[in-house]
Amino acid sequence: MKAQSSQEQEDGLTMLHRILKDDNVDMDSALSDMEGPSVNQNLDKLEIDYRNQFEIAYRENSFENLEELSDETIGKHVTLDTLLKMDNDVIFKDENIFDDEDRSSRKRQRDSVSDTDTLFNEQTDSKKRKDSDMDSCKNAIDSIMTEQILSPISLSPTPSSDGSIQNDKTESLEIAKDLPKEPRKPVDKPARAKLKNKYEMSNIIIHKEDIPAANLRNRRSMVDNNVIKKISPHSSADHNKTVKKEPVVITNEYTVSQVAQMKRRIIDSHKLLLNFNVIKDNYARACVQLKRSVTALKDSEIHRAHLILENEELKKQLQALQQHSTGKEEANSTNIPKQNILKNEADS
């Protein structure tokens, strides 16, 4: 309904604009033309209704409500601009307009109340959130202060690395300190049986101590016993002064040492990359030089082939010259005896 009413109002305004386009139009003649039966038959019902509304509004505004118009508008003819500038109550006296205004004012009041409520709720929610955040921060700080500071375990080595072996050594030394000091009694070695005959080998009893492997085991056990005797509670302080304990896997010292090792490895890898780049550049230069030498060798081979051809041609020319010279010599040798014979005949 609202859309239809708005469309109707727009159509009425367009018609008003057409009628009131010119200031010199006679409104009475226009109204008489609009009331004519020939025009009303061709127009639709909506146009007729709007024309009737326009007539009513024009009559009310032009004759009865002259007091409400200003001095400037009384002298001039009524146009669309003047009608639009006037209040809606003067042109269209409808009760629906007042109802819409009341409804809009009520809606505005309700919206203002709802906005205040929402602002109050948002402020209370923000305060609650801030309080909860402060409580959570305090709890987190307390938990962090109570925790023990440890190094990251991700940097600790695997069980197969050197760090685990060093840890095992330290643990074995600590266990050895707690062992009793009772020395082991030396074992009496039995005397070896002397061989009198080679047939008495079956009667000889071979002791385990005579075997070289068993002797090695006994020696190792004796060395371990001596080490355990040296590590006593009285001499532990001196031993700690002389020998530096290696850092445990979970301490910060171990992580620092690991970081230093990683830095060294990174530097070494960087050096290797630089050396590789230098080698690569030298290899590229060597390849370029090799290519140039190959091209020079090909050119020299071609030049050598040309020289060989020239040499063969020169040899042929030399042979021809030699043949020509030999022919001349033979001819000269034959001509000399003939001349001598002729001279002798002439003398005779």
From Swiss-Prot:
Annotated keywords: Cytoplasm, Nucleus
Stretches the record annotates as Disordered: 101-135, 148-167, 319-348
Locations listed in the record: Cytoplasm; Nucleus
Predominant subcellular localization, coarse grouping: cytoplasm
Function: Involved in cation homeostasis and in the regulation of the cation stress signaling cascades.
Bias (Basic and acidic residues): 124-135
Cytoplasm is among the record's keywords: yes
Keyword field contains Secreted: no
Compositional bias ranges of the Polar residues kind: 332-342
Full protein name: Protein ATC1/LIC4
GO cellular component: cytoplasm; nucleus
Organism: Candida glabrata (strain ATCC 2001 / BCRC 20586 / JCM 3761 / NBRC 0622 / NRRL Y-65 / CBS 138) (Yeast)
Biased composition (Low complexity): 149-161
Domain of life from the UniProt record: Eukaryota
